[in-house]
Amino acid sequence: MSRKLLTLTLLVLMTACANDAPAPLQPMVLDFAKLGKINLAVAHLSYMNNAPRPPTKDVAVFQNYKPQLSDALYRWGVDRLQASGTQGQATLVIHDADLRRDTLPLKTGIDSWFTRQQSERWSGKVTVDLRIEGAASNFAGNASTTVTRSTTLPEDANAAERENAYRRLLRSMMEDLNTQMERAMRDHLNSVILTMP
């Protein structure tokens, strides 16, 4: 009798261990408002997404992660840019918002049996352009930047590892974009910047 009870207990424990899924991650929230508004001497601010559609094979890898890269770029514009003038138009144009997955070659041989190799590279590229037209004194100009980043994933990466890799990639790209766009705006659009933190 005790042998049957022991066997049943072991089966229950094994089943419980097999079904242990990683705890779901909290939704990723990108908040650029804490960085402060960049007030521009224009009356209107708009957003345009001209990014080409990514290859189908890459869409399938990234489509379920939130926020999507183009949504994060839009959020940056809403949180950071403010039209505070009486004339002129500012347009934040997304030219590229691309994420790609590449397979990495794996080593073979006995040594490879005991190491967890990096099997995938996820790469991201963003190009944005802030265009100013018809501002005071008929000022027209633009500030643009391109950001590229990548991260690797180990072989047989689980769902949590993949989600964390996406978050790392997205967060690092957006931090780079913020820094580079601030610099580009100071260099090329200084005459229409009213205030910048």
Regions inferred by a protein language model and the residue ranges of each:
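Bacterial N-terminal signal peptides that target proteins for export
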Residues: 1-6
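Bacterial signal peptide processing site
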Residues: 18-21
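N-terminal segment of the mature soluble domain
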Residues: 39-103
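Short acidic, glycine/tyrosine-flanked loop/strand segments centered on an H-E-D-like triad
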Residues: 43-55, 135-162
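Surface-exposed short loop/turn segments
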Residues: 88-142
